[in-house]
């Protein structure tokens, strides 16, 4: 199952409530403000702070 990009209109970072960006290659949602990456498992975003990984822009 793939991630539905329409979800980006309604989901937000659980930490700062900011906008999330989709990283298709890594299957993650990125919060650039908090520098966190949230995994997407089987097309479902896991928006739990304890599941987020540190993110750095390439």
From Swiss-Prot:
Pfam families registered for this protein in UniProt: Trm112p
Superkingdom assignment: Bacteria
GO cellular component labels: cytosol
Family: Belongs to the UPF0434 family.
Protein's name in the database: UPF0434 protein Swoo_1821
Species this protein is from: Shewanella woodyi (strain ATCC 51908 / MS32)
